[in-house]
């Protein structure tokens, strides 16, 4: 696999068997938006590709569960820190399951690594990288000769993103420990960690060595990832990661989607209108490094492309596909899956991979038209679809449930009742009533398909 490193702007070959990946996760003070979803889905695809080709992957995605935004939420809501963070961690994980994002091997929470953070600050203090102000302990960026080597920018370009509310030695200096009487007792003074320190301590505790891949949104490159790299370089005496990957923004009306800009489109809102697999397909439909503007029509088109996958699956009577063995050894046998893996090995070229998937579905349907009773052909296509589902992370649902998605329990009961009435009318040769029921259901965007095994129904989405 070759991946474009955000730092060197060059494709770096990843030819190890064992791969370590750390993905910066959410700050858990509110529901997750599509920007969070895109980061998780893009790097879940990376993980799936590595697993599918036999790599052993150690994957961590953290939770920032102590932060100024969470404290503000505490003040507004009257809830405790634990009540807020537990609620939104559960909410986030529900969203990830809906998007078929594999559960990480490690899900560290910042509050569980306070001792590790303090140990890191001690190392930095011992070597003269810190100083103390009235509100906390700061990292002196002027002492790090390689500071800004990650983002490769002049500091002047980034000043607008930095806070200088206190008299720091340098505008780029950042807080390691914030004094706060309400939190952790230690030799530096009661307080809580700075955001940039949290990730370094968690990475050091879990992985101990230089990461193969550090991933996150492009907005984290500076200052967050720059400051992480500085602490690891100066405190742990090693490079934090060999490859840095950053996904592009999700935009709404040309603006970056952000909770702070109050233009977030929450995952839960999207899931009310579209199933998780359709949303996943949409979020994967452009290259992970590119920005894309949220568009309802593009999301609808992604759903139509996914429909074609399920139409072929339904034609083969292929039921629910298990996602379980993707985390174990899965053997890729089909030629199409091997071709798609080869494409995705080039910096996750997902647009090209999905185009090849579209071509495969069209070709498979043509072959089935010619040889509808060829059992070997059907079995080969079934195996290919199963392998492709595990690589892309969609296509697992039972086809009947897929095409009935979005119908409430009450609506389902009414539909089934009308189908029984129609079946009885047909038995009694009352075709006018049978046709009237079909038209009644069609007006409610329900289409009927009469088969040798009875009548089945689907929801019409267009």
Swiss-Prot record:
Required cofactor(s): Zn(2+)
Gene responsible for this protein: cysS
Record protein name field: Cysteine--tRNA ligase
GO molecular function: ATP binding; cysteine-tRNA ligase activity; zinc ion binding
Pfam family for this entry, one: tRNA-synt_1e
GO cellular component labels: cytosol
Residues that coordinate or bind Zn(2+): 24, 199, 224, 228
The keyword Nucleotide-binding is annotated on this UniProt entry: yes
């Amino acid at each position: 696999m070759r991946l474009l490193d955000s730092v060197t702007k060059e494709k770096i070959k990843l030819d190890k068997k064992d791969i370590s990946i750390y993905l910066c996760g959410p700050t858990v003070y509110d529901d997750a938006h599509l920007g969070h979803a895109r980061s998780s889905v893009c790097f879940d695809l990376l993980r799936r590709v590595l697993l599918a080709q036999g790599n052993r992957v150690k994957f961590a995605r953290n939770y920032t569960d102590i932060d100024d935004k969470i404290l503000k939420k505490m003040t507004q809501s009257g809830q405790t820190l634990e009540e807020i963070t537990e609620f939104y961690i559960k909410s986030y994980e529900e969203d990830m399951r809906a998007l078929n994002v594999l559960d990480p091997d490690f899900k560290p929470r910042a509050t569980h690594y306070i001792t590790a953070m303090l140990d890191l600050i001690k190392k930095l203090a011992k070597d003269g990288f810190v100083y103390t102000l009235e509100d906390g302990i700061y990292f002196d960026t002027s002492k790090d000769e390689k500071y800004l080597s990650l983002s490769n920018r002049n500091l002047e370009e980034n000043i607008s993103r930095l806070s200088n509310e206190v008299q720091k030695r340098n505008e780029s200096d950042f807080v390691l420990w914030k004094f706060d009487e309400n939190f952790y007792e230690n030799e530096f003074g009661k307080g809580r960690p700075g955001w940039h320190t949290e990730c370094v301590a968690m990475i050091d505790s879990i992985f101990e060595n230089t990461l193969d891949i550090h991933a996150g949104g492009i907005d984290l490159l500076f200052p967050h990832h720059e400051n992480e790299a500085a602490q690891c370089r100066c405190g742990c005496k090693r490079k934090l990661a060999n490859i840095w990957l950053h996904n592009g923004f999700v935009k709404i009306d040309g603006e970056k989607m952000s909770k702070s800009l109050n233009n977030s489109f929450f995952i839960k809102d999207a899931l009310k209108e579209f199933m998780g697999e359709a949303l996943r397909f949409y979020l994967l439909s452009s290259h992970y490094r590119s920005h894309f503007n949220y568009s309802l029509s593009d999301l609808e088109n992604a759903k139509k492309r996914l429909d074609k996958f399920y139409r072929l699956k339904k034609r083969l009577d292929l039921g629910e596909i298990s996602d379980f063995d993707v985390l174990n050894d899965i053997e890729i046998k089909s030629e199409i899956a091997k071709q798609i893996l080869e494409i995705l090995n080039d910096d996750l070229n997902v647009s090209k991979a999905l185009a090849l998937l579209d071509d495969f579905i069209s070709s498979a349907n043509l072959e089935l038209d010619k040889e509808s009773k060829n059992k070997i052909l059907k079995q080969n296509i079934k195996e290919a679809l199963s392998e492709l589902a595990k690589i892309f992370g969609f296509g697992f649902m039972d086809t009947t449930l897929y095409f009935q998605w979005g119908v409430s329990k009450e609506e389902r009961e009414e539909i089934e009742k009308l189908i029984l009435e129609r079946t009885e009318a047909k038995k009694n040769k009352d075709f006018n009533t049978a046709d009237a029921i079909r038209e009644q259901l069609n007006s409610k965007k329900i289409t009927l398909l009469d088969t040798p095994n009875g009548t089945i129904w689907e929801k019409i989405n267009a």
